[in-house]
Amino acid sequence: MAFVHFGIHTEFSITDSIVCIKALVKAAKADNQLALAISDLSNLYATVKFYKACLDAGIKPIIGSEVWLENDSTTVTLLASNQIGYKNLTNIVSKGFVDGQVMGKPIIQRDWIFERSEGVIVLFTEKSDVGQAMLSGHP
């Protein structure tokens, strides 16, 4: 059965992870994983290194980022499902740095995600408003 972790942070999530891309891809290859995703916190800095390492190992790379939402104390994970999604993802994350900085933290407005949703998959946690609604039986 195929399985992919969507919440992996790499060494590019400086305060959050020490996972090195080379070791990550090597472990995934040894485990015969067909795909591998990264979702560093509020950035896409690892994209090129990760993408090349995955292709060299014969693994499908999935690019994402875990981002903070405005007026919310939780995060969502945004994944690019195709090239258009990758362009939209880079735009959303960049906009957080340019227009959404709050005390040095890039914050994403939900409208930015809706406006650039094509090709972007949004994963909510159980702590988000969407997750809480589902847990309480009100999807």
Name each model feature, range by range:
Residues 1-139:
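Phosphodiester-processing cores and adjacent nucleic acid-binding clamps
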